[in-house]
Amino acid sequence: MLKPLCVVIGTTGAGKSDLAVQLAKRFGSQVINADSMQIYRGFDTITNKITVEEQENVHHRLMSFLNFDKEYSVPEFERDASRVIDEIHSQGKIPIVVGGTHYYLQSLLFEDTTLSAIDKLTNDSSPSKPPHPDSHILDDDPSAMLSYLKKIDPVMAEQWHPRDTRKIRRSLEIYFHTGRPPSEIYSEQKMKSSGSKLRYKSLIFWAFADSLVLMPRLDKRVDKMLSHGLVDEIKSMKSLAESEKFSPDFTRGIWQCIGFKEFMPWFEAPSDIVFNDCLERMKVSTRQYAKSQKKWIQSRFLPMCLAQQDLSPSSILFSTTNTTDLNNWEEQVEKACRVFQYFFYNGDAIAPSADDQHAFEKARDYLSIMNGRQSQKKKFVCEECLDKRGDPFTVIGEDAFNVHIKSRKHKTTVRRKKERAERQIRLKNIGILK
């Protein structure tokens, strides 16, 4: 019989931490952090940790324990979270896991997921094994890493955007650890994980807010962070990096947190104009992160949950918590508590709400195409358009490319190029241009 586990997911700023606290208070439990930035000791403001006051005397685990110069893998989280969950179960309580690092949660909930299995594969390499002779490429620039990946695994290279440094490096790490093309390993693990099993009897709450409300809310939160010592923390992080005499990698460890890299231009050219520009960049990055989290939930996490629900309805339940209107917060908390009570103690489930049904419908669409065409993983380059850096515009997936081709931006670019070419021909015809 599966032991119970409650999980609260959601985008940044949607109120998932507050919901987890209220559930823990109501049912006398503890909260386990599943945010990859909040595991680090210190830097409470830039990583948006819940304050001591906001915790309301609820014990929070796996938070603020890792030193800034360390990294924390998926298998390490899986191991530590499982240990804490067992400990809470031994006290007769139902653990509540909360966080926005969804690959942590996916690995914890489901056995043999692709991400978890591949991380274990690379972590299990013998310490005495000599490094790969080409592993120095991991410290090179993204274009060099991508060129190397194209040589050893062109299939994998086609799936990553040229500027997705983290994924390109990860693919190379897999190759250097295993000696095999990462696409081959991903394919094998995907076949194995297609039948992934639940580890726990799982109740999953998705705290969400309408984008028109969430985005301004996120902007205000960044402004609030500014008044709570954000700049001092960024200065402290920069000083730590300088004291250790290394250049921070913005794609790894604590250095990934939103705000650090965005404010680097201000240190190089301090002025009010540059500061305000950096602040705006941080707000944009925060909004983009929220969008990517929502996409992950809708297209990956929720479909996996629904697939399991189809197999075993009594083992997993997905429920939404709408935080758009904070005037209805107490009502939403009460709804979540009723769902918790019915699912874990009454052995039943409350009928899905309208928000639940809407989420399920979108997830069903994603579920039907989850293992769809390879063209959705292929890289497409537009020969007409340039991105913000002046590089050829690149997207992943045929559908995304078709959307771009039909966009006003693409059509305008093509029209202007055509008009310029026609103008040059006319000028040549009248002898102005040779």
From Swiss-Prot:
Keyword set includes Cell membrane: no
GO MF annotation, one: tRNA dimethylallyltransferase activity
Subcellular location, record wording: Mitochondrion; Cytoplasm; Nucleus
GO BP, sorted A to Z: tRNA modification
Enzyme Commission number(s) from the entry: 2.5.1.75
Residues binding ATP, per UniProt: 10-17
Name of the protein this chain belongs to: tRNA dimethylallyltransferase
